[in-house]
Amino acid sequence: MSPAGGRVPPSLRLERQFLRAGHALVAGVDEVGRGSLAGPVSVGVLVVDAATRTAPTGLRDSKLLTPAAREALAPKVRRWAVASAVGHAEPGEIDAVGIVAALRLAGRRALAQLPVPPDLVILDGNHDWLSDPREPSLLDALDGLGDPAAGLPCPAPAVTTRVKADVTCAAVAGASVLAKTTRDALMTARHEEFPHYGWAGNKGYSAPDHLEALAAHGACPQHRRSWRLPGVAAAAGVPAPRSGPGDALVDVTSDTSSPRGA
């Protein structure tokens, strides 16, 4: 049975290979909110070590779980992990530096919350957006990235990328569940301030009710105004989104009507 189908549970096989190779702490990292029209992009990090036991029953990539299953798993995942955290980059930061640099910022904020930095990060996908860019960017000025006084990891831990790591690696799947449930809670809370957009249900993605509200009411401060928001004219004075490796992967047509919305 192919693990890509989600029917084979993720395991610690890859994490344990790295632990046996001499890494004391290995972290799984995954993001959520990349393709959303509103709200933050969020990055979860979950750390395991050689003593970490088998993952909680039912753990899967967050996109393969119902909201109720994710919520039930989240506290179990936190107790199972050696350490865990979720970091965010807000819409204004995404507009200022672009989605890839915003992912890096959110990931570094998550790593900065850990009591001890991991020796190695397993990052879902094939693009390393967590490590320092080859050239300085607006991100450096925005959040003091690279300055130890800013409380952010400097330098970033070693990173290895794995396609479908959120499906096959338990630490990454756990990170995806924590990132998703944390961001969902944030968007539900922000729904109270901006109820027109239906964020309690669509979580900021381009569901029909959100698109209808955008057409009727326009964008609010929680929207990513540098993006091409359906039915909304580009905001004056907002910089064009900065492009970078992986930016083309942004999907603003994500369907959150099923458990697969992330």
Swiss-Prot record:
Reported cofactor(s): Mn(2+); Mg(2+)
Signal peptide interval: none
Predominant subcellular localization, coarse grouping: cytoplasm
Catalyzed reaction equations: Endonucleolytic cleavage to 5'-phosphomonoester
Positions of disulphide bridges: none
EC number: 3.1.26.4
This protein's UniProt keywords: Cytoplasm, Endonuclease, Hydrolase, Manganese, Metal-binding, Nuclease
Domain RNase H type-2 per the UniProt entry, residue ranges: 24-243
This protein's name: Ribonuclease HII
Species of provenance: Kineococcus radiotolerans (strain ATCC BAA-149 / DSM 14245 / SRS30216)
Gene behind this protein: rnhB
